[in-house]
Amino acid sequence: MLIENTVNKLNEMRLTTMAKAFKDQLTDTNIANMSFEDRFGLLVDQEWTARKNNHLKRLIKNARFSESGACIEDIEYHADRNLDKAQIARLSTCNYITERHNILLLGATGSGKTYIACALGMAATRNFLQVRYIRLPELLTELSIARGNGTYRRVIQQYKKPALLIIDEWLLYPLKETEARDLLEIAEARYKKASTIFCSQFDIPGWREKIGDPIIADAICDRIVHNSYSIIIDCKESMRKRKGIKEI
């Protein structure tokens, strides 16, 4: 009865892994000969590991990666991509996030920017950091709706929170003035407070052209560019083509 009560109390406290491990110990003859301290240590380790794994799963789910299977180890370093493997390895340690720096991921369509960004994001979740991936068109739509229903400041705060924000399709299209001001709000909210990865087909002069208003463009770029590492992918062949169906 005492054992059953103990298991029930563990479950009631939501220590379900520890409860199961405790029951397993009762039938394991090898563990029966261990000291109380060692047995208890095993129970704590199993509960701690389960909680860490569940936390990681939640972080990955909430990040909403478009490439959910992306990882640093699977990045392809073809010669024509001119990727600096040592640089990416350094960035995968996530020190740039601790230092509140950004990453500019620049390259033509199909060069694999999104995959690399998601791989870096996955590395951040492995370090138990909050990450959020979003395409810029979706972000602008969300901010436009928020302005209309009175939740604008709340949404800005939501995008201020993640330790790493990944914005894909950055400035792919020319902005309206209200959209440019929205991006300035995001840039200001995260400036020197959190890190952002910007995936873009265009270099900085191209950004200014897409933003339009030169004053807003200066304000946005000043909050992003001077605090960023750059990864420039000079890809001769699209990664989509490389991974597409081969002719028989």
Regions found by a protein language model. Give the residues of each.
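Charged, compositionally biased N-terminal leader segments and the immediate start
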Residues: 1-20
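Interdomain "pre-motor" coupling segment immediately N-terminal to P-loop NTPase/helicase cores
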Residues: 16-68
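N-terminal pre-Walker A segment at the start of P-loop NTPase domains
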Residues: 70-92
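Conserved hydrophobic/aromatic pocket- or pore-lining residues that grip, position, or stack substrates
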Residues: 75, 117, 135
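Phosphate-binding P-loop
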Residues: 92-100
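Walker A/P-loop
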Residues: 105-129
